[in-house]
Amino acid sequence: MQKSLLAVLVAAGIGTTASAQKPTATAPKSYSAAGKQVQVYTTADNSQLRLSATDKLSFKEVGQPLETQPTVFVDPTHTFQTLVGIGAALTDASAETFAKLPKAQQQEFLQAYFSPSQGIGYTLGRTNINSCDFSSDTYTYVQDGDKELKTFSLKHDEKYKMPFIKQATAAAGGKLTLYVSPWSPPAWMKDTKNMLQGGKLLPEFRQSWADYYVKFIKAYEKAGIPVWGLTVQNEPMAKQKWESCIFTAEEERDFVKGFLGPTLKKGGLSDKKLIGWDHNRDLAFQRAATLFDDPEASKYFWGLGYHWYETWTGSGMQFDNLRRVHETYPDKHLVFTEGCVENFKFDNVQDWKLGERYGNSMINDFNAGTVAWTDWNILLDETGGPNHVGNFCYAPVIGDTRSGKLIYTNAYYYIGHFSKFVRPGARRIATASSRDVLQTTAFLNPDGKVAVVVMNQTDKEQPFQLWLKGQAAQATSRPHSIMTMVVN
């Protein structure tokens, strides 16, 4: 990308859309689109359109829609879950790449992601406890064998990760909803004596490991980084070549019920949102049933986290499993905790399918009841790393440390069609499409604006009408495009 992203967004008029937010949107008893305008923002393949203000539409009163009229129906009087936020993981790899960029590009990056007016307004973050694959080395915060955690120190994180998180928080207006996840306990706490290649937490170290979470959260907060929540274990059913640890559903339930939950409570951290599973959609229902059907375990869990990598088995994305969880446990919250496109190749950073995978997932995940959506690495370098086991992947923004430039993939813009226009406190509202080529979701923001996202993954343009309570506005979805239609 040759031109500064900020200049592109301002030129498109996007810098004028931010407004003061109320805590939570309230469903209106009635709604009329009469007299309202629709500002359309578009990102489309084979064009220069990237979150560009493209059309301004008006509503007209219409009668019964016909089957021959492609229509996106929206009803703001029917509301569902409340959005916590949209964002990404601030990993060691992201922090190290950020530190290698020139100061001007660092500031561009921070505004591009975290400014709601000049960027795409991220409000959510995730970071790792101990090392993960997207670290340059394997590390923990204690010396080997220190069961009482007397040697606990954040010295490793103080070099890159913590300053990075603090700058991101400042760029987000001083508030970032941050949650934390471990990939593995220290090697000496495991049956394999290895942080990599799976293995299990030894029973005699369950209390020490529970204490470890509390130590980490309190140390981060003492250092000026508030922590909103935590997951129990990243990908607990995967034996990976990187940091990993296996927990069956019963083992996770019993660890939380007997150790982690009570330890958080004893440590004064009961307000932290505890999220179970943190793995793929395929086994999500079975995990939820095991964790939430036990009242002594369930009382500690705020929600269930999930990833999108179930496709490694040859399956498609299993969104219906999320619906089963939401239907069965409506008091628990669904959180998308990780997703990226793997097998990085620099020549493919502008592959349009990158963005479409995000758009497809986000629309379906939100429609299934998801309250928070977290991309994987927020920034990676020109190799798709750094990564200490060679597991390179794509990030929406690539920091080319050779040239010092930022490369914005179309995934950045696709995510921005949600994060920029659907703000924390927004309520998902009823929406339906009369054509399967038009995927859609919609939200009512705290400021009263309605944001409707419409995506077209086909090679053909699709005219349609946006229909709200007997009022319709005429629009066209371009081939391989995503639109956000802001009704005000």
What are these regions (language model features)?
Residues 420, 431-469, 480:
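Carbohydrate-binding surface patches
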Residues 1-28:
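Bacterial Sec-dependent N-terminal signal peptides
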